[in-house]
Amino acid sequence: MLRSAVRLAGKDVRFGEDARRSMQKGVTRAVAAVATTLGPKGRNVII
């Protein structure tokens, strides 16, 4: 049986402006990853 080693990050709770900036940074990265993999018809997304 194959076992994959997965390390999960600890919880990082943020509030206010710091939370908004962190969320925006993650959304921007996701948009950049999806935008480059949409393909000719826009049906395929690989992240």
UniProtKB/Swiss-Prot annotation:
Q: Transit peptide where, by residue?
A: 1-8
Which cellular compartments is it found in? Answer: Mitochondrion matrix
Report the GO terms under cellular component. mitochondrial matrix
List, alphabetically, the InterPro entries matched. Answer: GROEL-like_equatorial_sf
User: What's the chief localization of this chain?
Assistant: mitochondrion
Induced by what?
A: By heat shock.
Swiss-Prot/TrEMBL keywords: ATP-binding, Chaperone, Mitochondrion, Nucleotide-binding, Stress response, Transit peptide
Alphabetically, the GO molecular function entries are: ATP binding
Q: Which family does it belong to?
A: Belongs to the chaperonin (HSP60) family.
What function does the entry list? Implicated in mitochondrial protein import and macromolecular assembly. May facilitate the correct folding of imported proteins. May also prevent misfolding and promote the refolding and proper assembly of unfolded polypeptides generated under stress conditions in the mitochondrial matrix.
Q: What is this protein called?
A: Chaperonin HSP60, mitochondrial
Q: Give the species this sequence originates from.
A: Leishmania tarentolae (Sauroleishmania tarentolae)
- What lineage does UniProt assign to this protein's organism? Eukaryota, Discoba, Euglenozoa, Kinetoplastea, Metakinetoplastina
Q: Which gene encodes it?
A: HSP60
